[in-house]
C-alpha cells in the first residue's frame, strides 16, 4: 500500500506541476501581461474613428471592430510583418502615405493610415462593383488579391480564428459595441 500511495502522490505532483506551467504559459500570452503593450482608452479611439471614418466613406463601427480584431486597441501591437493598432504591413502603409513606417506605433497615425488603406481597398472593390463590408474585411485581413483569386467570394476564404473577423465575414457590421459617452 505504501508504494501505491507514493506513486499517487507523485502523479498528483506531476499533474500540479503541469497545470502550473500551463497557466504561467497562458498568462504570459495574455494581453495584460505584455510589458510592451500600450492599450489605448476605448473612448479616445472611438471618438477619433466616429469623427474621421465617415469623412472617408467608412462605417465607424466597422473600423472600430477592425481595431479590436487586429490589436485589442494596443498601440504597440507588433507581429512579424505588421505594426500598430490596425496591424498595417509596410506595403499597405506605403500604398497610402509617405509617412515613415516607424510612426506606425503612434496610435492616432496608425488609425488614420489604416482608414486610408480601408478607403483604398473599398475603392478597389467598388471599381469592380463588388463592394460590401464582408469583402472589405476579407481584403483587409487576407489581402485584396487573395479575395480576387477567390472570385470575391468571402465564403471561399479561410475562416478566421478571430471571433470578430468571423462576425465581420458573416456580415455583422458592428460586432464590437462602441463605448458609451
Description of each model-found segment:
Residues 2-18:
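N-terminal Sec-pathway targeting helices
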Residues 23-73, 108-111, 172-180:
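Export/targeting segments at the very N-terminus of extracytoplasmic proteins
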Residues 34-39, 49-53, 74-82, 96-108, ...:
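Second-shell loop/turn segments in exported
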Residues 49, 66-94, 117, 143:
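Cell-wall polysaccharide-cleaving catalytic domain and substrate-binding groove, primarily
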Residues 55-59, 79, 130-132:
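Extracellular/periplasmic catalytic domains that process cell-envelope and extracellular macromolecules
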Residues 62-63, 84, 132, 136:
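Residue-level detector of well-ordered alpha-helical segments, enriched
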Residues 90-149:
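Alpha-helical segment that forms one wall of the substrate-binding/catalytic cleft
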Residues 131-181:
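Catalytic and substrate-binding regions of cell-wall glycan-acting enzymes that process beta-1,4-linked
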Amino acid at each position: 500500500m505504501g508504494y501505491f500511495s507514493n506513486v499517487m502522490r507523485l502523479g498528483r505532483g506531476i499533474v500540479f506541476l503541469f497545470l502550473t506551467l500551463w497557466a504561467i504559459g497562458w498568462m504570459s500570452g495574455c494581453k495584460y501581461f505584455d510589458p510592451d503593450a500600450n492599450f489605448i482608452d476605448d473612448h479616445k479611439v472611438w471618438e477619433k474613428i466616429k469623427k474621421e471614418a465617415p469623412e472617408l466613406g467608412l462605417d465607424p463601427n466597422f473600423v472600430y471592430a477592425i481595431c479590436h480584431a487586429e490589436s485589442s486597441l494596443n498601440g504597440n501591437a507588433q507581429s512579424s510583418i505588421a505594426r500598430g493598432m490596425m496591424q498595417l504591413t509596410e506595403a499597405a502603409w506605403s500604398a497610402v502615405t509617405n509617412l515613415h513606417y516607424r510612426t506606425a506605433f503612434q496610435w492616432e497615425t496608425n488609425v488614420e493610415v489604416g482608414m486610408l488603406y480601408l478607403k483604398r481597398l473599398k475603392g478597389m472593390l467598388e471599381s469592380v462593383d463588388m463592394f460590401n463590408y464582408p469583402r472589405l474585411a476579407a481584403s483587409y485581413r487576407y489581402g485584396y488579391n487573395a479575395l480576387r483569386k477567390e472570385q470575391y467570394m468571402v465564403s471561399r476564404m479561410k475562416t478566421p480564428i478571430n471571433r470578430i473577423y468571423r462576425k465581420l465575414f458573416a456580415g455583422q457590421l458592428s460586432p464590437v459595441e462602441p463605448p458609451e459617452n
